Regions:
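Terminal low-complexity "docking" segments
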Residues: 1-131
Length: 131
């Protein structure tokens, strides 16, 4: 199902003003299906593998280069892979890319979506990956 959703989101992104629809489709599949936060250990770490170092480095580099378009595409694409939907930094990168490229309305929607997720899954923001 996730592979089919990726195909559909690629199509939607290519449509005029289709980014938000594509983003919400993937976010619905990845976030709205979560029923509880991952079980943490005593230090607040989960057994979930962290984002790859190259993914972290790429997003940092794109931010420093102020390449907002590529940063948005990279963060959005990364979100759909592995356990990256739990990597809340991606929401920050998406928000930054939208804000810095003058798309404040979309950035506000990202904030509202994240507030909803954190309200529904209280404590998610306190967790850490296994590293």
């Amino acid at each position: 199902m996730l592979a089919q959703a990726r195909t559909l989101t690629e199509y939607l992104r290519e449509q005029p003003d289709g980014w938000l629809s594509a983003h919400h489709l993937m976010k619905s599949l990845r976030h709205d299906t979560l029923r509880a936060i991952p079980a943490p250990d005593a230090q607040g770490r989960t057994r979930i593998e962290p984002p790859r170092a190259d993914q972290r480095a790429l997003l940092k580099r794109l931010y420093l280069q102020q390449n907002w378009t590529e940063m948005l595409e990279t963060a959005d694409s990364t979100f759909s892979r592995g356990a990256n939907h739990l990597w809340l930094d991606l929401q920050w990168y998406i928000h930054q890319a939208l804000t810095k490229s003058g798309q404040e309305t979309l950035a506000d929607i990202i904030v509202a979506d994240l507030k909803g997720l954190l309200t529904r899954l209280a404590g998610l923001e306190t967790l850490a990956f296994s590293d």
